[in-house]
Structures are given as structure tokens and as C-alpha cells.
Amino acid sequence: MKMNAKFISSYDDYQKCPEITKPEYAFIGRSNVGKSSLINSLTGVKNLAMTSSKPGKTQLINLFTIEETWILADLPGYGFAKASQSSRIKWGRMVHDYLKNRTNLTTVFLLVDSRHEPMKSDLEQITWLASNGIPFSLIFTKIDKQSLTQTNKILASWTKVLSENWEELPKMFLTSSESGKGTEELLTYIDEINKQIAN
């Protein structure tokens, strides 16, 4: 289903982002985790978010309005981006400043590649979000690239690692940008939160 999704603008500082009262959902993950592809699949709008086979394509805070009811924030990835260390530090600071200070931020969706065991950089992001009291959920991407058995194996590994420090695990979604699997569940979750906020 094609949604009414429109690009607002890109920003290199959260303070330059427009003041918006609508609930905002941020998407973040390692470089090349499939973030832009998932956003396009989620909204049904091809090339809404620019995709690239090269890690580090997204370098700014990109805001989109969805159905004129909520805001989607596409944030720079972390990890393998082919950029100088100073640039990566700058991006990291920009993202963390946004996440800590964006007043209408409702939830962060942290994307992880379903083909990989828990990685240090992902776990560090989870720890940082939790320590700063920022609500988040996990989205496992690219489940179409492997068997269901392998996906379940990776999911079990994540559950085991997170259970070592968490009594209640974050909500998890299994998705595929190719088939669209999981996008309906994700949109339903966002819609439920929006209704709770409205009430």
C-alpha cells in the first residue's frame, strides 16, 4: 500500500529541525543494514529514502511526514561507513544529540541484520538508548536472505544475550524489504502508539 509520505528536509543539527508536535519515530542501525530499503518498503514509496550499496549513504537527519499524522526520521548509520574518523564522531554526536533532545521523539527503531549474531556496536547502541531512557524496539532486516531456521537461531542468540541484562526484552520485528514481510505489523504498532498519544 502506497502511503502519503513526503520528504521534509535534511538537517545536520537537531536544533535546526522544525518544531513538530506530531509523534516522531527514528530509524537507526549499522551502515548498510537496509534502513533506507525498509523505509521505502514500509511506506510503499519507491526511492523515498535514497538507497545505496555503499555503506554510509545517509549522513544527515532526514525527516519525512507520513499520512500527515506522524514523522519518520532516517538517521545516519554507524559502523562500516567509509568516512574519516572525525566525520564518524561528528555523525555520532549529531545522532545522540537528536535522540536525547528531540521533544516529540516517540520511539527509536534500531535495525539489525538478521544474518548476524549480536554485534558489539549494536549492543552499545542498545545500552546507550536504555541508559538515556529512550524507548526503542528492534527490527531484524533481510530475513529473506536466509532460511527461517537460521533466522530463529539468530533471534534466539539475541534473546539470550539481552536476557543477561534485561528482565523485559524490547519488542522485536522480523522484516524483509523485498517481500514486505513484517511491515504491516510494524505499521500497526506505530498506529497503536499514535492512538495512545491522541487519547
Swiss-Prot record:
GO biological process terms, semicolon-separated: division septum assembly
Highest taxon in the source lineage: Bacteria
Needed cofactors: Mg(2+)
Pfam families cross-referenced by the UniProt entry: MMR_HSR1
Entry annotated with the keyword Transcription: no
Coiled-coil residues: none
PROSITE patterns linked to this entry: G_ENGB
Tagged with keyword Protein biosynthesis: no
Function in brief: Necessary for normal cell division and for the maintenance of normal septation.
Name the record gives this protein: Probable GTP-binding protein EngB
Taxonomic source organism: Cytophaga hutchinsonii (strain ATCC 33406 / DSM 1761 / CIP 103989 / NBRC 15051 / NCIMB 9469 / D465)
Highest classification ranks of the organism: Bacteria, Pseudomonadati, Bacteroidota, Cytophagia, Cytophagales
